[in-house]
Amino acid sequence: MTHKEKAVNYFSQKLHCSQAVLAAFADECGITEEEALRLGSCFGGGMRKGEVCGAVTGALMVLGLLYGQKSAGDTEGRQLSNKVNDLMMDRFKEKCGSYICNDLLGCDITSAEGHKYCVNNKLFTEFCPKMESG
């Protein structure tokens, strides 16, 4: 199964977008599925505030684990992680128009009305999986 397929599969199990992306890469990141699910659990729905999309924060966690700064003196790691962060976020915004959850979904998911809009328009089941699969 590809990473995209894994992420969509996790998301279809009612996991947060951030959990789905991070768990799809758990093996490559040297963490367990449980660790990935726990680490990503507070980042879904733009950290439950409609802010940065959980698929983006999940991807940033993956990039941090793969390329991140390993110590205070690891300036190369810091520079590399900054570079891959900017590259990923810029590409996501270019492809999707934004990396803000509320902007992507076209509503305020923190409100009852916004959440209802997403459910009624199948955004969580049809639109969000597209974010998972990049």
Locate the predicted segments by residue.
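Active-site-proximal helix-loop elements at catalytic-domain edges
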Residues: 1-29
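DPxDG-like acidic metal-binding loop motif
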Residues: 58-66
